[in-house]
Regions:
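Conserved GNAT acetyl-CoA-binding A-motif
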Residues: 129-138
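Residue-level detector of family-conserved "landmark" positions at structurally sensitive sites
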Residues: 45, 120, 137-138
Length: 138
């Protein structure tokens, strides 16, 4: 699994509407604004983040610099480079060849326009063709 994780540090998957790429430090400001939003937190079945932006930046820096072996965090951009959300596959279980998948289109301008569908198709294709994962659940 470790080699699989290392390969994701330069991830770039181009779909019909979106580009999935590795997370970078420049994503922090938009990510923070989405994570503190009560409506988005509710849609993600969680609570809004209560950290200050500085505290959040520390966690974000660690996530970018020291990725977990058990999760892969991915930025979602439009084809013209606008960061509109994130997705991840996590709870990676090598013994069962399975993981969980989550997605959030944080930028409301892109809701209901097919971007989420494009992300799911692109991400699942990547997962099933580039990893040993055989089952993905939501």
């Amino acid at each position: 699994m470790k080699a699989e994780q290392q390969a994701t540090t330069d991830l770039r998957i181009v779909g019909d509407l979106t580009v999935l790429r590795s997370k970078i430090m420049d994503d922090a400001e938009a990510d923070y604004s989405w994570r503190v939003d009560p409506e988005l937190a509710g849609l993600d079945a969680t609570r809004p983040v209560t950290l200050t932006f500085i505290e959040y930046m520390r966690h974000h820096r660690d996530d970018v610099n020291y990725p977990s072996l058990w999760s892969v965090r991915i930025a979602i951009d439009t084809l013209d480079g606008r960061h509109i959300g994130n997705c991840m596959y996590y709870d990676i279980n090598p013994d069962k060849s399975q993981c969980e998948f989550g997605i959030m289109i944080g930028d409301r301008e892109y809701w209901g326009r097919g971007y989420g569908t494009d992300v799911v198709k692109s991400a699942l294709k990547h997962i099933f063709t580039s990893t040993r994962i055989k089952r993905v659940y939501l």
